[in-house]
């Protein structure tokens, strides 16, 4: 094998590699020490402050009512996200379709639900029972009282419909990030539209869709605290405040709710990390030596940090 970097001056001795010393950053250590000192001061001050009500905090941290409320919060989060993801995917397809009517309907939906505050929407869903008691179809009348009196269901619908407007843009951006040639190649192989989306487009788009969707899931967990506007108060924040009002101690119960939110959010973040790793299989942002050699051959120049050695054929 021969080195392609050989030239007229190949016989000259190669220079010794530079022994670079890492740059020192004393300012970082000073800043870290200041932050640690301030954090330690705040923690010690808070632990010695009776206004935080640490006895109440310890008494209610694992209370059965709080644990049940945490389960209600998780159920609200998952059901609302499922509704939001499914409806958001449908809206994304409608926006990318060639039908102007479907595009207009999807745009109007996004305009309304992204343009109004989620709290206002939830208040509206809570008042829906006073606006519509029944629906008269002429030949039949549908009673809505039993449906609209289910506050948990209204909370899921309100959160899910709002989330769908944001998921539609996330899904649309992920699909549009896949090169158009992928769709054309799939059609050339005889795949129909649904098979192309399932086997070609979505697996590549998921690498772009998953990170913002994970952020939306975490955001949805915290947004469930707003369903008291419906009103639905059996979730974590509402239940904590009910206990706080009976004890006249809002601070420790707020800390209890915050602790549960932090634990659940941390679990979701770990799940998001491994899910992103799963969909990143087969993709990399670095080039292998063979790819660098091919790039050098295409450009007619060899990168300075790469030595290209031609492959020898294997003997039979």
Swiss-Prot record:
Sequence ranges of Polar residues compositional bias: 1-14
Domain ABC transmembrane type-1 per the UniProt entry, residue ranges: 70-274
Listed SUPFAM superfamilies: MetI-like
Segments for region (Disordered): 1-20
Keywords in alphabetical order: Amino-acid transport, Cell membrane, Membrane, Transmembrane, Transmembrane helix, Transport
Phenotype upon gene inactivation: Deletion of argTUV in an L-arginine producer strain results in a faster and 24% higher L-arginine production in comparison to the parental strain.
Pfam families: BPD_transp_1
Classification via InterPro entries: AA_ABC_transptr_permease_3TM, ArtM/GltK/GlnP/TcyL/YhdX-like, MetI-like, MetI-like_sf
Subcellular location: Cell membrane
Record bears the keyword Membrane: yes
MF term (GO), any: transmembrane transporter activity
GO annotations of cellular component type: ATP-binding cassette (ABC) transporter complex
Gene3D superfamilies: MetI-like
Membrane topology: Multi-pass membrane protein
GO biological process, one term: amino acid transport
Keyword Cell membrane recorded: yes
Membrane-spanning segments: 29-49, 74-94, 108-128, 151-171, 217-237, 251-271
PANTHER family registered for this protein in UniProt: L-CYSTINE TRANSPORT SYSTEM PERMEASE PROTEIN TCYL, MEMBRANE COMPONENT OF AMINO ACID ABC TRANSPORTER
Subunit: The complex is probably composed of two ATP-binding proteins (ArgV), two transmembrane proteins (ArgU) and a solute-binding protein (ArgT).
Family as reported in the entry's similarity comment: Belongs to the binding-protein-dependent transport system permease family.
Chain's role: Part of the ABC transporter complex ArgTUV involved in L-arginine import. May also transport L-citrulline. Probably responsible for the translocation of the substrate across the membrane.
Name of the protein described by the UniProt record: Arginine transport system permease protein ArgU
Organism: Corynebacterium glutamicum (strain ATCC 13032 / DSM 20300 / JCM 1318 / BCRC 11384 / CCUG 27702 / LMG 3730 / NBRC 12168 / NCIMB 10025 / NRRL B-2784 / 534)
């Amino acid at each position: 094998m021969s080195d392609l970097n050989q030239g007229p001056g190949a016989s000259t001795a190669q220079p010794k590699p530079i022994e670079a010393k890492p740059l020192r950053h004393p300012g970082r250590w000073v800043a870290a020490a200041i932050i640690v000192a301030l954090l330690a001061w705040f923690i010690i001050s808070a632990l010695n402050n009776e206004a935080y009500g640490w006895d109440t905090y310890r008494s209610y941290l694992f209370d059965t009512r709080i644990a049940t409320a945490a389960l209600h919060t998780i159920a609200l989060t998952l059901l609302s996200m499922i509704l939001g993801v499914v409806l958001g995917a449908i809206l994304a397809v409608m926006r990318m379709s060639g039908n102007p009517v479907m595009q207009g309907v999807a745009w109007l939906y996004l305009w309304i639900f992204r343009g109004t505050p989620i709290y206002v929407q939830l208040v509206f869903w809570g008042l829906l029972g006073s606006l519509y008691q029944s629906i008269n179809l002429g030949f039949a009348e549908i009673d809505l009282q039993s449906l609209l009196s289910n506050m948990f269901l209204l909370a899921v619908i309100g959160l899910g419909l709002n989330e769908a407007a944001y998921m539609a843009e996330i899904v649309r951006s992920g699909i549009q990030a896949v090169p158009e040639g992928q769709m054309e190649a799939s059609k050339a192989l005889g795949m129909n539209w649904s098979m192309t989306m399932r086997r070609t487009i979505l697996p590549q788009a998921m690498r772009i869709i998953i990170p913002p969707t994970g952020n939306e899931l975490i955001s949805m967990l915290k947004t469930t605290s707003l369903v008291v506007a419906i009103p639905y108060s059996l979730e974590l924040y509402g239940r904590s405040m009910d206990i706080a009002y009976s004890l006249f101690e809002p601070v420790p119960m707020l800390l209890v709710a915050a602790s549960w939110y932090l634990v659940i959010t941390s679990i979701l973040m770990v799940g998001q990390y491994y899910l992103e790793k799963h969909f990143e299989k087969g993709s990399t942002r670095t080039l292998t030596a063979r790819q660098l050699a091919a790039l050098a051959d295409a450009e007619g120049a060899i990168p300075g940090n790469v030595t290209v050695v031609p492959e020898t054929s294997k003997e039979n």
